[in-house]
Amino acid sequence: MKKINEIFYSLQGEGYHTGIPAIFVRFSGCNMKCSFCDTLHEDGIMMSDEEIISEVVKYPASMVVLTGGEPGLWIDESLVDALHNEGKYVCVETNGTCVLPGNVDWVTCSPKEGGEVRLNHIDEVKIVYVGQDVSVYLDLPARYYFIPVSYTHLRAHETSLHL
């Protein structure tokens, strides 16, 4: 059983897959406490893999994004295999502190200050920039970097981002 906050259909709004239709499976719970997080971590219902798949197949997208909270606390190879069996391309959005199953198709790591990244393979790094030193993330084993800038933070502090 896995604690699910919500399952919904939308377009991927950021990163490498921006604009692609996707089914989002938002897991509850996280091992980090970020002030800017938009997930209600305690909300959700316990669902089996079969119940998750039953909801996912109601939507037309071939891409599934496992997000959170922290999906690494919940996902396993059997869930990813079940999604693959339904013809789904499986993406995970993670803070990188949990080892992920090896059968995930795309890994987006959004590292957080104070969290040790434990991933050997990362397709994309997404850094939520709120004024921190992002150079510490440039050595992560990633193919792509995506840095959404917090406009309100930049305005408030008149800061510019230099990489």
Language-model segments: residues:
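Conserved Radical SAM active-site core
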Residues: 2-9, 21-22, 33-104
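A short beta-strand-turn-helix
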Residues: 13-15
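Residues immediately within or flanking Cys/His clusters that coordinate Zn2+
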Residues: 27, 31
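Glycine-centered loop/turn positions within well-structured domains
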Residues: 32, 161
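Radical SAM/AdoMet-radical enzyme domain recognition
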Residues: 76-144
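Acidic, proline/serine/threonine- and glycine-rich low-complexity intrinsically disordered segments
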Residues: 148-150
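Conserved small/polar residues in nucleotide/adenosyl-binding loops
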Residues: 152-159
